Amino acid sequence: MLIYIHGFNSSPESYKVSLLKTFANKINMPDVLEVPALSFDPAIAMQQLLTLVHKYQTQQGMRPLCFIGSSLGGFYATWLAEKFDSRVVLINPAVKPYELFEDYLGYNRNIYTGQEYMLTMDHIDQLKKFKVDEITHPDRYLLMLQTGDEVLDYNQALEKYAAVPSIVEEGGGHGFTDFDRHMETVLAFCGVNCLKAYS
């Protein structure tokens, strides 16, 4: 099972999610991907994710679980990967989102859902609780970066995940331009046998 964790002010309707869903359907595995619609509130968002993981483990036992996190979702995915000893793909991940949130304090609106909400210092404090100081199993990570990220400094991720296998592309942007070129790489890393699925 793959759990995709979207970024701040994003949703399950994002571009990368649509590409992943299309590819999963193409290889006849539409149920391999879960994409929860997460709350803007970090504590609630993490509880949503933990509930989903617990549900999956209850239903599927110890079958492999892989997280795919984009931007803020990469920050959450890192914490979850360490907690559950899971594989994880990080796409232009936020390393210090609690610092970035300071620019968004106050009124915000989700461009996908239209939801309006207030971001407070309490939310920043919540985020800090999910900070991971040490990556214990770098081989379980795949880092994907584009140097043209206009939102995050990709060098922070290079430093944070220095020991992690990585794909670093020149140019691009925060949304990871031409992400569709990496579908098979991402799913294969997560343990999905694309060739078998095609047959």
Predicted regions: what is each one?
Residues M1-G61:
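Active-site catalytic motif of lipid deacylating hydrolases and related acyltransferases
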Residues L2, R63-C66, Y141:
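Generic beta-sheet signal
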Residues Y4-F8, I68, M144-Q146:
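Short hydrophobic segments within beta-strands
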Residues P64-G69, V89:
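Short beta-strand immediately N-terminal to the catalytic nucleophile in serine-hydrolase-like folds
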Residues I68-A77:
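Gly/Ala-rich beta-loop-alpha elbow adjacent to hydrolase catalytic centers
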Residues W79-K83:
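Active-site signature of alpha/beta-hydrolase-fold catalytic machinery across serine-
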Residues R87-S199:
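The alpha/beta-hydrolase serine catalytic core
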